[in-house]
């Protein structure tokens, strides 16, 4: 488990990757399409990717705001997920890579409408 210290200038809707500062001299490139989910750890976040996990000193809200809204959605105060990684939705939970995550009450309407919108388009 690598522990990057911070994220440098972040993504826009057209950005395909972000750079994470791992130490004073090294930046690690993370492809946005490799991100599975982001979990809040108070003032830190854990970014789970296909290739590993990264812990970054940043809040979930500020990091989520910098991600493309058509690719990622906040499902709970503790989780933001990649929309294309959602395997199923049942009641107030989603499944990603065989693991169930509860959708928070304040996020359920947005999550379901976003998923329906993706089905229509």
Spell out what each predicted region is.
Residues 107:
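Conserved short segment within the HATPase_c
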């Amino acid at each position: 488990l690598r522990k990057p210290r911070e994220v440098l200038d972040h993504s826009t809707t057209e950005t395909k990757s972000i750079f994470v500062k791992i130490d004073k001299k090294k930046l690690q490139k993370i492809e946005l399409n490799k991100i599975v989910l982001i979990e809040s750890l108070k003032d830190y976040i854990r970014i789970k990717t296909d290739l590993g996990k990264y812990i970054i000193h940043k809040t979930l809200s500020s990091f989520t705001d910098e991600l493309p809204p058509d690719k990622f959605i906040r499902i709970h105060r503790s989780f933001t997920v990649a929309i294309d990684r959602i395997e199923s939705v049942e009641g107030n939970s989603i499944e990603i890579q065989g693991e169930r995550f509860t959708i928070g009450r304040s996020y359920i309407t947005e999550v379901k409408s976003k998923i329906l919108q993706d089905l229509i388009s």
